[in-house]
Amino acid sequence: RRQRQMCIRDSTDYLYVLPVDSVADEPLRVRYNVPQINDEFAETCGLLWRHAQINLLDVAVDGAGVLTPSFIILEPDYLLDISSLAECFREYGHHPANYMLARLQMPDNTRPLLLGNIANLFLDEWIHAESEPDYLECMKKAFRSYPIELAACADLRDREKEREFFADCKRHFDNIRQTVTDTFRASGYELDKTDAVLEPSYICEALGLQGRLDYMQRDMSSFIEMKSGKADEYAIRGKVEPKENNRVQMLLYQAVLEYAMGKEHHRVKPYLLYTRYPLLYPARPSWAMLRRVMDVRNRIVANEYGIQLRNSLQYTAERLRDIAPGTLNERQLDNTLWKRYLYPSIDAVTQKIHALSPLEQSYFYALYNFITKELYTSKSGDVEYEGRTGASALWLATLEEKSENGEILYDLAIRQNCAADIHKPYLLLERTHTDIDTLPNFRQGDAIVLYERNVSEDNVTNKMVFKGNIEEISDCNIRIRLRAAQQNVRVLPMESRYAIEHDYMDTSFRCMYWGLSAFLSATKDRRDLLLNQRKPEFDTALNGAISAAADDFVRITLKAQAAKDYFLLVGPPGTGKTSRALRSMVEAFYREGKEILLLSYTNRAVDEICKMLTAITPEVDFIRIGSELSCDGVYRPHLIENVLEPCSTRREVQERMARCRIFVGTVATLSGKTELFRLKTFDVALIDEATQILEPQLLGLLCMRGVTGGNAIGKFVLIGDHKQLPAVVLQSSEQSEIQDEGLRGIGLHNLKDSLFERLYRNAISPVSYTHLTLPTKA
């Protein structure tokens, strides 16, 4: 049913391909554009390039050996997320540029997102509960799960919107109760909550898709995808119908179950649960529609491939010009929905890009290029490298290759199954197979995928996948914290053997694209500073004190205080950058009553910052943003979830956050925690390990606006050593090199370099207000 091919060339009548996994004497012919069989892939076939990899699915072979597939999947090793693909199907059309548009739209109205998260929590409670859950207790759990999000939500500060929100929460709770207790048991539904799996993930190499379901029966006979928003109330008068993007999502899950898990779609009952009504809607499969959807997927992947291959500002600009109301409005809508809601959301991005200066546009396109190339390489591996790299190594690399690199632990047996613990579900696994010649490349806090592996053919592409993090690891045992609790012990059979591998997540890339969005909306003052269009400013009143400073650490602190925009501290290892210089700056800014944000690249470095903060006397109050498993146990009392635990109202959360003037975390964590900046504005950010942080990784934080419209971060201090530990980049130096003369003129020579390095090169003179180099020994 499935064949992996490499495209050689096309002609009017056929594609000519070679098998990837076998030897052929001559190219095979593939018939395409066949009405009612595969003509939906006409646009895909027009985009193919020499050596493009394609999967052919449901292939018929005629007497002449000509292949006629029902599905043509382009570059299947590049996995698209099912929900992201489904969201490209909008009321106004399904142009692939919707995928790029979504990247550049930071979530601003958090109320619908919050309601969705809380509804998911309600579903978990109703599935796990042996007796009837209490609504108020569930809302308390929701508050403990999302304290910052609830406290920062602007809509909830409006009395009427607040009333509506909590009325909606109660309505969704009651509707989920009705669905689970009544509809599940109704004739024809065949849903059994005692034999359910919550949040299983699937990786489907055949279709080039990945996704996570809300609810699945263990035997995969039926599944539920839950939606807290509105269905389509206008398509048919007096009738509620699923929205197209929701129908597409369900269709993709059905296809994944068929092509990854071997579950024929007509034997699976898929349901859309609209908790607003409630409506448990049986979704109807349409393989013709699926082909149209997969053609859109292919066009998105071709777009991504083209951007990373061309590596050209002009080409990227052309692709991004498709983000325009006239292009995306394929259905030529002209109604109120389009004019009032849809058009403005598209046009806002279009106009912001147009409003950039030529230099700013070049910078924007260069970073978009770079991020897209990094993402492509992280998914599919380097197209110029023969080894198995990137997320696709999960299914392309052999067991021997994975074992040699320490990238898999297998033959694991469950010794303790606490997956039903709804607060902190975990598994204790024993290593029954150890290879003394290789060291596992896993450590505490790592994100992993877990799956049953009882025979050599079992892998992430044909088994149900559970996501989690490593809580503890030793030579004999591994303790895994599961992302979702599983009340049903049969989901993870004791008699099975299991494997874990690294999880490859797009979160960091999503945050970098959000950083570009923040750049579009940044203050002109901050954009000019970052692009060297104005000089950094300083308070010259401290000149005398700086000249008379008793030692380097006093001088550093005074220079950091004098800087109005930024200050760079260059320090080789062992010079006391963290233990003395950073501490001295924190103490000085704290005495001045400043709001301080402390950042680093790694969690280990954040632990060191926490160690420094706890050594300050008198004691300072600080909050750490981050994961419990990535935090040293000594500093876990300072984690935000523990600090806010005594709070029972949004006002108490807001007051506790306002009282604390020092916040700590990794750049990656804070970049994804945008709601924090709706509650806090920081006078200064002190950023350690700055030479390990890529410019697009830091851009969003430096460009973000606070609630009043000014910069969310006032000035910033970058601490690092440009001669030590460069940032980790997947693409080669040649690929990340900047050719544009305008960008080279502001010191941007290569995007593998950090912002620290660029600003250091732009320093006015060796003895400057902008930076200071520590001597070799502290």
Regions found by a protein language model. Give the residues of each.
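Pre-ATPase regulatory/linker segments immediately N-terminal to the P-loop/RecA-like helicase/translocase core
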Residues: 95-98, 273-279, 287-310, 439-558, ...
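Mg2+/Mn2+-dependent nuclease catalytic core
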Residues: 17-49, 193-299
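Conserved helicase motor core of SF1/SF2 NTP-dependent helicases
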Residues: 591, 602-604, 617, 654, ...
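A non-catalytic, helix-rich entry segment at domain boundaries
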Residues: 122-198
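A helicase ATPase "motif cassette" and its flanking acidic/Ser/Thr-rich regulatory loops
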Residues: 1-5, 9-16, 116, 120, ...
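Conserved Walker A/P-loop ATP-binding site and its immediately adjacent core
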Residues: 598-611
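Conserved small/polar residues in nucleotide/adenosyl-binding loops
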Residues: 3-11, 769-778
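Conserved ASCE P-loop ATPase motor domains encompassing nucleic-acid-directed helicases/translocases
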Residues: 13-18, 22-45, 55-56, 376-529
